[in-house]
Amino acid sequence: MATASESQAFAGTSKRERILRAAVDVFAEHGYFNAKVAQIAKAAGVADGTIYLYFDGKEDLLITIFREHTRNYLRSLEQQVANINRAEERLRVAVRHHLETLGRDRALAVVSQVELRHSLKFMSLFSQEEVKDYLNVIRKIVEHGQAEGTFRRNVHPQLVAKAIFGVLDEMVTSWMLSDKDYDLPGQSEQVADFILTGLL
């Protein structure tokens, strides 16, 4: 069983991984715009100048966090669904994977749900490809379900993928903003049931 630290993103021991983890924590605590490179360096246990050996600055850190997290997330999701034949079960796994990934790392959830979305430049220039890749994974699950006759064929797979993302995104945001420390991954079955009600 993974420990709490192993379950978090960027939990490696290399300087680069430590800097990325520190950036996640500092951005979540202070906000991206208020965060200082010196704070990130201190949290990572490195000199201020060491940050610039790996990254161009705060924006590069934010972009790298998003891109590497998304790439690792999608790789893990695709591995989990690869050997599952039934589309319904694939969708359940995708829902659980989304809520577990962010539900075990509140700082990463804050960065993903809040800090990354403050910048119109970031949203327009850097996030489109990664979001498209995510939606494609979900879309393929829906198409698979339609092809096997499990899911309704009178709904557009891309529209369904966007709706599923919207539901999961709001679940994470609500959990992140809540005063109650509840089990977000524990809600995955109910959320999957709700989504599947519209597809079966």
Model-derived segments and their meaning:
Residues 1-30, 34-43, 60:
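Basic, helix-initiating cap at the start of DNA-binding domains
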Residues 1-4, 21, 93-104, 136, ...:
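C-terminal peripheral helix-coil segments that are non-catalytic and often amphipathic
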Residues 15, 58, 65, 69-73, ...:
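Hydrophobic/aromatic residues within well-ordered alpha-helical segments
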